[in-house]
Amino acid sequence: CNSKGMNATALTYKLDASNKRILDVSRDALLRIFTCAYAYRMTGDAKYLTKAETDMNAVCNFPDWNSKRHFLDVGEMATAVAFGYDWLYNELSAATRTKAANALLKFAFQQAQDKNWNLNFYEATNNWNQVCNGGLVCAALASYENNPSEAKDMIEKALESNKPALEVMYSPDGNYPEGSGYWCYGTLYQVLMLAALNSTLGTDNGLSDTPGFSKTAEYMLYMTGLNSKFFNYSDCAPSSTAALASWWFADKYSNPSLLYNELKMLKNGEYASCAENRLLPMIMAFANNLNLDAISAPSNKLWSGKGETPVVMVHTDWTYTDTDKYLGIKGGKAGSSHGHMDAGSFVYDAYGVRWSMDFGLQSYTTLESKLSALGGNLWDMGQNSMRWDVFRLNNLNHSTISINDARHRVNGVATLTTTINTATELGATFDLTEVVSDQAASATRTVKIVNDKDLVVMDEIKARTDKSAKVRWCG
């Protein structure tokens, strides 16, 4: 809650360029209220209390929190008001407390109970389930005494709907289908919800025991390559950012080594611009019981995970110098949430250069408007969707196999068949047959680092009897 935040103009209800979201407003509100509430609790300086209360009143005076168009906005706004209400309860005016409790009821709880809205976040197996449920649970726990029936309903629905989502997103090994950027987002809200449940009710009802969930911070540890770049498959940007949820896992499992990359980023000043900085003060609570003085590098060079989007990542020595080489390879399918036609693609870092790369996501707002003007829908994941006309999203842009310049099959799954982990070779083989089955009889790809210095890519493709196979791929 710095001088820029303290002097920021009043929060106003404003849809973004897509006329669909107020998500930026919700996130700005969360940044202001959460950080100022934290600053007040740490310093006792009334200016932070005043600013947080002003911003709480502003958003509680909105006509709604945009539940009709984009319920994700509600999840983040409910989180903002919940933390302000809970952390500042004794110091807030009675009028503000009443207004906040009423807003949570009217704009969040009742909207989550209204069948007129698209409430598919309850059935979703992606970050929406985590963010919307996480925000609603925090709000329900904070204001339970005011609206016990609705709050109880929010908590019970979250416990019921979140468990199957976790099983899809993290089982069996912890790798996250939507990639690094959405791990930082969705998993952060997930641990926020778990921490709130445990601190208030003494249990998370077994959610944290979901197979693979305890391993997911290690997956994220291996997702960072050289030069501060993620293995950025799916709708994710290449620049690495703070994985704030890793602090919860380090505390939960008494394993500070999970913070090897986080401490490096923190010391380099990279946390100052982290994507999820609106919840940055959380790490202070999670770090309270950790010894951060001597954290060693991971002992294993390779990490592999199966599940919806199987991946294999390699760091040859974890020094982030010229002796360290980094490789990330993925399988899965384009039809997954935020998926690209990138099954079989890989990134490779060596000697300060990302030799094989992924462009990553493109602005949703611009793509939505452009495709809509052409009669398309960015979020239509069907085989013939205009989504796949976008160069960044189709296979012709990725370092995977393309045959006869045809699109990958959106529901074809590339499976991890072999993990290569020997003294001289590190990598994996994926079977891409389903992905290209309309163009080839079979296809496999092997990518490996040999002797910690050479990259080998080997594709084995068997043509169909009824057509030739013109093969291409780019890096």
Q: Model-predicted segments: where are they?
A:
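Aromatic-lined, polymer-binding surfaces characteristic
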Residues: 6-14, 18-226, 236-237
